[in-house]
C-alpha cells in the first residue's frame, strides 16, 4: 500500500472516531450510541508519585483529628523491656503488690504506676491492667516491710531522662535507683536465682533470760555474737521448713528450701540503742519463714529453747516456732546469676549486678530505712513486747495451734504476711 492510500485510510478512521457523541475522557473507551457518559468528578485528582491516581480525602471534617494544619502526627516510640532497681521504706504501706479495686489499702506499686503514667513512660490504660506492660516484681514484700534492692521488670517507652522524670512523681521514701535493658521475655520473679533479706533488731534481744536487759545499756558480747552466728549457720543447706510457715505440710516437696548463707554482722549504736543486722540469702522464702528463723534463734540464745529444737523443727512433727516482729525485715537485694552468665557478656545486654548503684542503695538505707526502724522500735518497743511472749511457747513437745499462742505484737510496721516472696 502506497503512502497516499495509507494516509486516506487514517483520515477515514479518524473521522468515524471523532463523530461519536458525548465527551471523551482520556484513558476511557468511547461511548457507544447515544448513551450518556458517566459524570466526571467535580474536582481534579492529585497525581502523586509515579502511576495511578490518588483521590482527595473525602472524610467528613468532623471526624478528622483536630490540630493545626502543620501539626505532625504523634511519634510512636517502641516499647522496651527493662528492669528498675527500687528502694523504699514500707512504713504506712500495705505491702508491695498492687490490689486493684481496693484503694483503701495503699501499696508501693500504686505510687509507682502513678509515677510511670505521669512521667509518660506508659499509657494510662496500662496502669489499670498491668499485664499490658508485662509487669512483674521479684518479691512481694508485705505490710511495713522495706526494700533496698527490689527489682521489677516491665515494658516502657524509653523517654529522655527517664529516671529523673519517674522520681519527680514519687515521694522521697520511694526511689528508682537504676535501670537496665533486658531480654524481651525477661521475668524478674522467674529469673531471680536468690534473694537476700536483712533483719535489723536491738541486740538486747539476745540477752539471756536470767539477766534480761531491755534498755539502752545492753551491749552484745563477742561470745554471744559467736553463739548467734553458730546457730544461724545451722540453717545453711536444704531443710524442710514446714514449721516455719503456716502454708505447708511436712510432706510437701515445696516446704524444702535451700539457704545459701545466714549470719549476724557486728553491732552498731543508733540513738543510744545498740542494733545488729542478720543477713540471710536463699533461693526463695515462704510466708513468715525468715521471721520464724530469727525468732527460734533468739529463743535458743535467751535460754527458752534447747539447741536440739532446730533439728526437731526440720522433722515431720509440729514444733512451736515463735515468729519475730515484722519490724526490721528488709529486702536487701535480688540475684540473677544464671541470667548474667548467659546474657551478661553477650555484648547486647548488661549484667544485673547493680555495682554502680551500691552507693545510692547505702545512702537510701541510711536516710530512710534504718531511721524508720530505729524510731519505731524506740516508740513502740515491738521487740521488747514480743520477747515477753517467749515464755508462753512450748519448745519441748508437739505444738498445737502454736502460731496463735499470744505471740502477735501489733505494730504499724508489722508484716501481715511475713517475708513476702512466697510461691
Swiss-Prot record:
Disulfide bonds: none annotated. It is found in: Nucleus; Cytoplasm; Mitochondrion. Transmembrane segments: none annotated. Keywords: Cytoplasm, Isomerase, Mitochondrion, mRNA processing, mRNA splicing, Nucleus, Phosphoprotein, Transit peptide, tRNA processing. Gene3D superfamilies: Pseudouridine synthase I, catalytic domain, C-terminal subdomain, Pseudouridine synthase I, catalytic domain, N-terminal subdomain. It catalyses: a uridine in tRNA = a pseudouridine in tRNA; uridine(38/39/40) in tRNA = pseudouridine(38/39/40) in tRNA; a uridine in mRNA = a pseudouridine in mRNA. It comes from the Eukaryota. Its main location: nucleus. Its EC number is 5.4.99.-, 5.4.99.12. This is Pseudouridylate synthase 1 homolog. It comes from Rattus norvegicus (Rat). The gene is Pus1.
Amino acid at each position: 500500500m502506497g503512502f497516499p492510500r495509507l494516509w486516506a485510510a487514517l483520515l477515514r478512521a479518524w473521522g468515524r472516531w471523532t463523530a461519536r457523541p458525548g465527551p471523551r475522557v482520556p484513558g476511557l473507551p468511547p461511548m457507544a450510541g447515544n448513551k450518556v457518559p458517566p459524570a466526571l468528578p467535580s474536582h481534579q485528582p492529585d497525581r502523586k508519585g509515579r502511576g495511578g491516581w490518588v483521590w482527595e480525602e473525602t472524610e467528613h471534617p468532623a471526624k478528622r483529628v483536630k490540630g493545626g494544619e502543620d501539626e505532625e502526627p504523634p511519634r510512636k516510640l517502641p516499647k522496651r523491656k527493662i528492669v528498675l532497681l527500687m528502694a523504699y521504706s514500707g512504713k504506712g504501706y500495705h505491702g508491695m503488690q498492687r490490689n486493684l479495686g481496693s484503694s483503701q489499702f495503699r501499696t508501693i506499686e500504686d505510687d509507682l504506676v502513678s509515677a510511670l503514667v505521669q512521667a509518660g513512660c506508659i499509657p494510662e490504660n496500662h496502669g489499670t491492667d498491668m499485664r499490658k506492660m508485662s509487669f512483674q516484681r521479684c518479691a512481694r514484700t508485705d505490710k511495713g516491710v522495706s526494700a533496698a534492692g527490689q527489682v521489677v521488670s516491665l515494658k516502657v517507652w524509653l523517654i529522655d531522662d527517664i529516671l529523673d522524670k519517674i522520681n519527680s512523681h514519687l515521694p522521697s521514701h520511694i526511689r528508682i535507683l537504676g535501670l537496665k535493658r533486658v531480654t524481651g521475655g525477661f521475668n524478674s520473679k522467674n529469673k531471680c536465682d536468690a534473694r537476700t533479706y536483712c533483719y535489723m533488731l536491738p541486740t538486747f534481744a539476745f540477752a539471756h533470760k536470767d539477766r534480761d536487759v531491755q534498755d539502752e545499756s545492753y551491749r552484745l558480747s563477742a561470745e554471744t555474737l559467736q553463739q548467734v552466728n553458730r546457730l544461724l549457720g545451722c540453717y545453711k543447706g536444704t531443710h524442710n521448713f514446714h514449721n516455719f510457715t503456716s502454708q505447708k505440710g511436712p510432706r510437701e516437696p515445696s516446704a524444702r528450701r535451700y539457704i545459701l548463707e545466714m549470719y549476724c554482722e557486728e553491732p552498731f549504736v543508733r540513738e543510744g540503742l545498740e542494733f545488729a543486722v542478720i543477713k540471710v540469702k536463699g533461693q526463695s522464702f515462704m510466708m513468715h519463714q525468715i521471721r520464724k528463723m530469727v525468732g527460734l534463734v533468739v529463743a535458743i540464745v535467751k535460754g527458752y529453747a534447747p539447741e536440739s529444737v532446730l533439728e526437731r523443727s526440720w522433722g515431720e512433727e509440729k514444733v512451736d516456732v515463735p515468729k519475730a516482729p515484722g519490724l526490721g525485715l528488709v529486702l536487701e537485694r535480688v540475684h540473677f546469676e544464671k541470667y548474667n552468665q548467659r546474657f551478661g557478656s553477650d555484648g547486647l545486654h548488661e549484667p544485673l549486678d547493680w555495682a554502680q548503684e551500691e552507693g545510692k542503695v547505702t545512702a537510701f538505707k541510711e536516710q530512710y530505712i534504718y531511721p524508720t526502724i530505729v524510731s519505731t522500735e524506740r516508740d513502740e518497743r515491738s521487740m521488747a513486747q514480743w520477747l515477753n511472749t517467749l515464755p508462753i511457747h512450748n519448745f519441748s513437745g508437739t505444738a498445737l495451734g502454736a502460731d496463735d499462742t499470744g505471740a502477735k505484737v501489733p505494730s504499724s510496721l508489722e508484716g501481715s504476711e511475713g517475708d513476702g516472696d512466697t510461691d
